[in-house]
Amino acid sequence: IDAEIVIELTPTNLKDGEPGLSHITSAMKYSKNVITVNKGPLSVAFPSLIELANYNGIMFKFSGTVGGGTPILEFAKRCLKGDRIVSFKGILNGTTNFILSKMEEGLTFQEALKDAQVKGYAETIPSLDIDGFDAAAKLVIMANWLMGMKVALEDVNRIGITQVKTQEVSKALEKGNAIKLIASCENKKLVVKPMEVSKLDPICVNGTLNSVTFSLEYAGNQTIIGRGAGGIETASAVLRDMIEIRENIINEKNWF
């Protein structure tokens, strides 16, 4: 294929990463730069994909896999590179955050899930979201890329939100807290589970918003908040990666 960039956008498969994994590896072997928003290949084979990209001297961009249009990975990798990330935690799945926000309004889990499905936030079979798989996949990508770990989905201690009761949500509210599905990386331990979070905590956002707080060795805590999903938002992430690859190609040509 006479192209400088291959964009891989097939549906996410968290079991074995296919067919996206084969698409990406084939493109890399033919020395094509690759962009993807597919979490599957990255959650099962991140270290080997980075190694293959480096071996073939190509650019591999995946900023849309975490946060969609909100540049969570880019923020951490670029803006925080003068410091050291000690740990991070946040809300990485907009669907579950929408459901838990609705439960704060008094809806049961099933009622909130139905509302999310009607609005198009949740799939007819919503297991990837409500059982924490989506958040875990994003956590794996962040841990590998930002913390230098070599982990896969099975390394995450994962609990979804299906057992969260409206009464628990109400009790948390009485204390000025909210129950959120929090993904965290601390002391090389990866956890996704419902947790009580203070309403005053910057990561305590509602609706379909995502949020991540990075704890730094010198600069304290830095938080990024934004919309985590959606067609236009994800498309903007692909465009962002395309622009960066284009700029790098132009710079290389000018250098020589």
Indicate where each model-derived feature is located.
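Conserved active-site and cofactor/substrate-binding residues in soluble primary-metabolism enzymes
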Residues: 1, 19-22, 44, 67, ...
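Hydrophobic, small-residue-rich alpha-helical packing segments that form membrane-like cores
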Residues: 1-5, 26-29, 118
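N-terminal Rossmann-like NAD(P) cofactor-binding module of classical short-chain dehydrogenase/reductase
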Residues: 5-7, 11
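Rossmann-fold NAD(P)-binding glycine/threonine-rich loop
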Residues: 12-30, 37-77
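Predominant activation on well-ordered alpha-helical scaffold segments within soluble catalytic domains
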Residues: 25, 50, 73-77, 96-101, ...
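Rossmann-like NAD(P)H-binding beta-loop-alpha module
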Residues: 54-123, 129-134, 141
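Catalytic, metal-anchored helix/loop core of enzyme active sites in primary metabolism
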Residues: 87-89, 97-100, 115, 121-124, ...
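Substrate-binding/catalytic subdomain of NAD(P)-dependent oxidoreductase enzymes
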Residues: 102, 113-211
